[in-house]
Design a protein with these regions (language model features):
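Transmembrane alpha-helical segments of polytopic membrane transport and secretion proteins
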Residues: 1-34, 272-291
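Serine/threonine-rich low-complexity intrinsically disordered regions
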Residues: 18-23, 63, 176-177
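A structure-centric signal for secondary-structure junctions around beta-strands
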Residues: 22-25, 56, 64, 221
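Alpha-helical transmembrane segments of integral membrane proteins
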Residues: 24, 72-291
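Conserved beta-strand and immediately adjacent loop positions that scaffold enzyme active sites
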Residues: 27, 66, 268
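Hydrophobic alpha-helical transmembrane segments of membrane transport/permease proteins
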Residues: 31, 35, 39-73, 227-236
Length: 291
């Protein structure tokens, strides 16, 4: 397989990207994610009150004064949901980027050099895969201590192996092509071959997995906070807000609105991930109707 063929495939994927993202579910995902990003960025201007302020009547239902009601301490729920987005979204993105970076590096090294190093890397992924992700994340977070930062570290430890597996397989496939073998014979260093010739060809599948993993990271981060292993009071975070809401079922709005925030963001990233997978997977790629 020549360099020209691989570049042609990359151009083909780029051409498919636009019509692929015009699918209805992709549009819905983009709109929801964009809306939440805007709300998170401008939360200080949009929020009607300070998320930690306790000067309002406690446990008041939704009204014109408090669209999402107030919680058990008299804090405005809408303000806390908006500020919770400023915590959950950037931290989830950071977690996914770190996990993808670690996993891609491990997978690239294992797939390119192979041999004993490949075996060591893959056994490390097997060790992580042996445990359910939420259980392993709970154990790591509990050992490190209860904080949002430690919860993020725990999720990175859980999330990197899939990237290593995917990148390893793709690197081994691309590494056997004629142009990579020719680069080796011409004396190209391993670093140059990986960075210039191999990794660009695995970017598509990694991007798809990162988009889908954003939804998983949000769920895990919220789940750990729900269990008391992530965000600690009085910080505004969606998972911890849902946890408090479960203690007051008669005041349904306290847990419902942060739960809806989690639901909408997770569904939106899943829509985006599925659409990107259609773009980069030739077997399920989107095809525009013929005129």
């Amino acid at each position: 397989m020549s360099v020209g063929i691989l570049r042609a495939r990359s151009r083909t994927a780029a051409r498919r990207l636009h019509p692929g993202l015009r699918q209805p579910l992709a549009v819905v995902g983009v709109v929801i994610v964009a809306a939440w990003i805007v709300l998170a960025v401008f939360a200080p201007l949009i929020a009607p009150a300070d998320p930690l302020e306790q000067t309002f009547p406690a446990s008041v239902g939704p009204s014109w004064d408090h669209l999402f009601g107030t919680d058990e301490l008299g804090r405005d729920v809408l303000s806390r949901v908006l500020y919770g987005a400023r915590v959950t979204l950037p931290l989830s993105l950071l977690v996914v980027v770190l996990a993808a970076t670690v996993g891609a590096l491990v997978g690239a090294v294992a797939g390119y050099f192979r041999g004993p190093l490949d075996g060591l890397c893959m056994r490390s992924t097997d060790l992580v895969f042996a445990f359910p992700p939420i259980i392993l994340a709970m154990v790591v977070a509990a050992v490190l201590g209860r904080s949002l930062q430690n919860a993020a570290i725990a999720i990175v430890i859980v999330a990197w192996p899939p990237y290593a597996r995917i990148v390893r397989g793709l690197v081994m496939s691309v590494g056997d092509t004629e142009y990579v073998q020719s680069a080796r014979l011409l004396g190209a260093s391993a670093r140059r071959a990986l960075v210039r010739d191999v990794l660009p060809n695995v970017a598509g599948p990694v991007l798809v997995l990162m988009t889908l993993d954003l939804a998983t990271a949000i769920l895990l981060l919220s789940g750990l906070s729900f269990l008391g292993l992530g965000a600690q009071p009085p910080q505004a975070e969606w998972g911890s807000m849902v946890a408090v809401g479960t203690q007051y079922f008669q005041w349904w709005w306290m847990g419902t609105f942060p739960g809806l925030a989690i639901f909408t963001v997770v569904v939106a990233f899943n829509f985006l991930g599925d659409s990107l997978r259609d773009v980069f997977d030739p077997q399920t790629s989107y095809r525009a109707p013929e005129e």
